[in-house]
């Protein structure tokens, strides 16, 4: 158990030491009438490299074939396209206070069925090196389904099952440790009692012999 705890603590320290940007996939199921966050995270390969980044989001509604641009975010300015499906519903939720964007996520408020479809987060990054500049581009694709009621995904179900299994295993281990300790303490107590009894009998026997010797001498 001590080894397991050490490994867990070590992993946490390593994770903390690395820190920085971590690319995470977006959820793909939004609930009708609720606010939904579409994740778009694009990390630099080298965090120490200076960069400037901007993004454009495009959308293809379910049942259609063409992508249309819905927004552009550059130099901390959000430019929304005229689209009644997203009018007053899109909120920037990515990096702020920097031109070096790595989190380019957005919120869609009051989700409707018209928001079902495919989203593309286009990331355009200009990297600055000592003697030159380099342009890169990445496209993050997200397929979104809008449902009436939230469904639990398989990952959360498995996580909950594993949590209960871990609780049961730890409980059994704790009970076994308590039984083992109880037996060990009981055995030690019994051995000490037997040792005390033996010492008492030896002292009693010696006292009787001394008394007998005194009577004979008289």
UniProtKB/Swiss-Prot annotation:
Which superkingdom, per the lineage? Answer: Eukaryota
Query: Which Gene Ontology biological process is one annotated for this entry?
Result: sodium ion transmembrane transport
GO terms assigned for molecular function:
sodium channel inhibitor activity; sodium channel regulator activity
Residues annotated as signal peptide: 1-18
What are the annotated glycosylation sites?
A: 93, 110, 114, 135
The residue spans the entry assigns to the Cytoplasmic side of the membrane are as follows: 180-218
User: Hey, which stretches end up on the Extracellular side?
Assistant: 19-157
> Which stretches make up the Ig-like C2-type domain?
22-150
Which protein, by its recorded name, is this? Sodium channel regulatory subunit beta-1
Identify the gene encoding this protein.
Answer: Scn1b
């Amino acid at each position: 158990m001590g080894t397991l705890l050490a490994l867990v603590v070590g992993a946490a320290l390593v994770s903390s030491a690395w820190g920085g940007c971590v690319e995470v996939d977006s959820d793909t199921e939004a609930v009708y009438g609720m606010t939904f966050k579409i994740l778009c995270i694009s990390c630099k390969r080298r965090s120490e490299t200076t960069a400037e980044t901007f993004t454009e989001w495009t959308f293809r509604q379910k049942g259609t074939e063409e992508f249309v641009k819905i927004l552009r975010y550059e130099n901390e300015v959000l430019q929304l396209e005229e689209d009644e499906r997203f009018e007053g519903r899109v909120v920037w939720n990515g990096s702020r206070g920097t031109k070096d964007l790595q989190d380019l996520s957005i919120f869609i408020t009051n989700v409707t069925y018209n928001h079902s479809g495919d989203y593309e987060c286009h990331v355009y990054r200009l990297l600055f090196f000592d003697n030159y500049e380099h342009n890169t581009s990445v496209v993050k694709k997200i397929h979104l389904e809008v449902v009436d009621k939230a469904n639990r995904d398989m990952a959360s179900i498995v996580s909950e099952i594993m949590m209960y299994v871990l609780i049961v295993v730890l409980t059994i281990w704790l009970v076994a440790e308590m039984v083992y300790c109880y037996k060990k303490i009981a055995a030690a107590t019994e051995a000490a009692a037997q040792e005390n009894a033996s010492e008492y009998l030896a002292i009693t026997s010696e006292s009787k012999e001394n008394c007998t010797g005194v009577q004979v001498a008289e």
